[in-house]
């Protein structure tokens, strides 16, 4: 009996064109299982099938939460627009730019938030949000590149978390899949999620 061919959420060429598979020249032990190969120039290439599978898992996981109880955090410039669009579509909360220390741990702060899940763009750059979420027992979902540690990350989405087009397609797919799970219309294009140059 022939094994059924895997069906991607988008054609694999769309993933490749967006550069989701482009890792870094550093590989952590945590990310080893998500590496497809290493190029001759030393660049690690991420496995797009594992990304596709994790997008499905993350969409199911996030769709279980009340939208307003999902907090997205992204310091990286190219993640601002995709995070804002995801939040508009899904109805989640977000913080782009600087994450104020104490946002998740200090009820005296005016910026204090009480999410039930935190979704960070990069656990290295957004480490303050990750450590605060961990300290108060909030699960963490993170986009992780080949150089990221997944310590304190409960659900890894293995992808290029730096590229403008890569971020657009990943957040677009997550928003689309969550909308599909919730039975909501989704009329946005990938370009709607893409940061300006």
UniProtKB/Swiss-Prot annotation:
Belongs to the universal ribosomal protein uS2 family. The keyword Ribonucleoprotein applies. The keyword Signal does not apply. This is Small ribosomal subunit protein uS2. It comes from the Archaea. Disulfide bonds: none annotated. Signal peptide: none annotated. The gene is rps2. PANTHER family: 40S RIBOSOMAL PROTEIN SA. InterPro entries: Ribosomal_uS2 (IPR001865), Ribosomal_uS2_arc (IPR023454), Ribosomal_uS2_bac/mit/plastid (IPR005706), Ribosomal_uS2_CS (IPR018130), Ribosomal_uS2_euk/arc (IPR005707), Ribosomal_uS2_flav_dom_sf (IPR023591). Keywords: Ribonucleoprotein, Ribosomal protein. Gene3D superfamilies: Glucose-6-phosphate isomerase like protein, domain 1. One of its GO terms (molecular function) is structural constituent of ribosome. One of its GO terms (cellular component) is small ribosomal subunit. It comes from Archaeoglobus fulgidus (strain ATCC 49558 / DSM 4304 / JCM 9628 / NBRC 100126 / VC-16). GO terms for biological process: translation.
